[in-house]
Every structure is written in structure tokens, then in C-alpha cells.
């Protein structure tokens, strides 16, 4: 794919092998699939369902393909100021990704054929909606960002897709609806936080992240009071959401304090990359609470 100008290389390379693990977890687009699988596991626990492995596999593989496609589409405009290290990484390795993606896509089709019909139906509906989102974001004639924020769309779609494995197996959908809504708010908070931090501005919108994090934490406590105290799976979701909101609140405070003091572009690039990795790592909290429950 020809581009008008060469893209810069990754601005912040790992300084050690240990630090390289979370960096490449992010650059290889493995962060979103990991978060999706962990929260799908949480929803299954809250719904008291044994979700088939194939449904979780479809979620993880499908999420990876969508994020890779989204980042490759983003780099069609190499001079766009919103491009970050993850975009540069995908552009530099686009040939490998173009070779690997069809193989992964074939694997995904095989998994889809083997998944439960109800989950396949719900995933098909979400896939169609996701394609409309892709068109609205990436096709110039259909740009919808001005009247429907991209962060909100991503947050809602991500949460719904994550809930499908457990949701499709339930007879009583309202049992899980409040927890899915809570996670959708958390995903939207995550997306808005990343967007705000990467714009590197200390505008009034930057305070929105902290305010949203407080709202998410309060909603987690409210849901815990109403439902989460009854069973371990429901408690794990509420506790995970509260902890994630608290972590994002803390990261927002770190961004506002540290960024205003730093004047070196290279330091800022390293800092923003670390903050981006930490933002997604903040959503890995179900790993702790569910592991604690199963001990």
C-alpha cells in the first residue's frame, strides 16, 4: 500500500526485556483481546454459565483482527497528528500483518462455524453494526465523528461483544444487563482517557476523565450494594470495575501533574506510551478477583 510520506519509527523502544513485554503486548494489539477475554470470563461467572471455549476464542481472535484492521486503516493518512506508536508499528510491519491476517481470519471462520447458534446470531448482529462504525470512521463520505464520538461507539460495541458469550446462553437477559452497562461505561472512560492524554492537553476536558472515573466507581458501589454482594461472580465484576475506575482516576492525576512539568518531547513520548499501556492494564482487574475467588 503506497503512502504519501514515510512514517516515523516507533518513538519509544523498550529499555529492557521486562519492560518490552507490556510494550509489545500493546503494539501487537494483544491488549484489547486480553481485556475482552477476561471480562467475558467475568460475565460468565456472574451469569453462572459455563461458556464454551470456542465462544471465548471467537471473541479473542475477532477482537485482534478488528483492532489490527482499524490501525492499518488509520495509517492511510501518515501525517495525521493522532497517529501513535501502535500505528507506526503496524505500518512498519504491514506486510507481515497482511500475510498473517488471512490465516487468522480463516481460523476465525472455523471457530464461528463451531460456536453455539445463539452466540453466532448475536455476534453477527454486532459485526454488522461494527462494519457500519468502520464505514462511519474511515470512509471520508461517511465521517460521523462530529455527531457521535468514536470513544463512545467503541466503548459500547466492545462491551456488548464481550458480553455475548454469556449473554447468549441466558434465558433472563436483565440478570446481566446492569453489569454490561457498567462495563460499557468503563470502556468509554478508558477510550476517552486515552484520547485526552494522547492529545497532550490540559484543557477542561482533561478533568472529564477524573469525573467519569468517579462516576464509574460510584456506579460500581451502587451495583455492588444492589446485586454484587449476593454471589462471588457478581462481586468480582463490581470490585473489578471499581478498581479499574480508581486506577484510571490515578493515571489521570499522574498525567496532569507529570505532563505539565515535562518539556522534553522524547520524555513525553515515553511517558505517553507508558500511560497508554497502563490504561489498558487497568482493565485487567478481573484477573485478580476471579483468581482470588477460585483459590
Q: Where would I find each of the regions flagged by the language model?
A:
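Catalytic cores of Mg2+-dependent Asp-rich isoprenoid enzymes
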Residues: 2-65, 85, 101-109, 179-182, ...
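Structural signal for the C-terminal ends of transmembrane alpha-helices
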Residues: 45-47, 112-116, 135-141, 166-170, ...
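Transmembrane alpha-helical segments that form the membrane-embedded catalytic/substrate-channel core
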Residues: 61-76, 128-140, 183-199, 244-256
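Solvent-exposed interhelical
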Residues: 65-99, 184-219
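Membrane-interface helix-boundary motifs at transmembrane edges
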Residues: 80-88, 113-119, 141-146, 171-174, ...
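Intramembrane alpha-helical segments
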Residues: 90-166
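Functional transmembrane core segments of multi-pass inner-membrane proteins
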Residues: 151-193, 199
Amino acid at each position: 500500500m503506497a503512502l504519501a510520506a514515510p512514517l516515523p519509527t516507533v518513538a519509544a523502544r523498550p529499555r529492557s526485556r521486562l519492560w518490552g513485554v507490556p510494550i509489545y503486548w500493546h503494539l501487537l494489539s494483544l491488549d484489547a483481546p486480553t481485556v475482552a477475554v477476561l471480562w467475558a470470563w467475568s460475565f460468565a461467572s456472574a451469569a453462572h454459565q459455563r461458556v464454551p471455549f470456542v465462544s471465548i476464542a471467537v471473541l479473542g481472535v475477532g477482537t485482534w483482527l478488528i483492532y489490527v484492521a482499524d490501525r492499518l486503516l488509520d495509517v492511510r493518512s501518515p501525517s495525521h497528528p493522532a497517529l501513535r506508536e501502535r500505528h507506526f508499528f503496524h505500518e512498519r510491519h504491514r506486510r507481515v500483518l497482511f500475510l498473517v491476517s488471512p490465516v487468522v481470519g480463516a481460523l476465525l471462520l472455523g471457530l464461528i462455524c463451531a460456536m453455539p447458534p445463539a452466540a453466532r446470531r448475536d455476534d453477527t448482529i454486532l459485526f454488522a453494526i461494527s462494519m457500519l462504525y468502520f464505514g462511519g470512521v474511515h470512509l471520508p463520505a461517511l465521517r460521523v465523528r462530529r455527531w457521535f464520538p468514536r470513544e463512545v461507539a467503541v466503548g459500547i460495541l466492545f462491551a456488548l461483544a464481550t458480553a455475548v458469550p454469556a449473554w447468549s446462553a441466558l434465558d433472563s437477559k436483565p440478570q446481566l444487563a446492569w453489569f454490561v452497562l457498567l462495563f460499557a461505561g468503563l470502556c468509554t472512560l478508558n477510550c476517552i482517557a486515552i484520547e485526552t492524554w494522547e492529545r497532550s492537553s490540559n484543557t477542561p476536558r482533561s478533568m472529564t476523565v477524573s469525573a467519569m472515573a468517579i462516576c464509574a466507581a460510584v456506579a460500581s458501589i451502587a451495583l455492588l450494594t444492589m446485586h454484587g454482594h449476593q454471589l462471588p461472580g457478581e462481586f468480582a465484576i463490581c470490585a473489578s470495575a471499581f478498581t479499574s475506575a480508581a486506577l484510571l482516576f490515578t493515571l489521570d492525576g499522574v498525567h496532569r501533574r507529570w505532563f505539565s512539568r515535562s518539556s522534553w518531547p522524547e520524555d513525553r513520548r515515553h511517558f505517553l506510551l507508558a500511560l497508554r499501556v497502563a490504561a489498558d492494564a487497568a482493565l485487567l482487574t478481573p484477573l485478580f478477583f476471579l483468581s482470588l475467588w477460585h483459590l
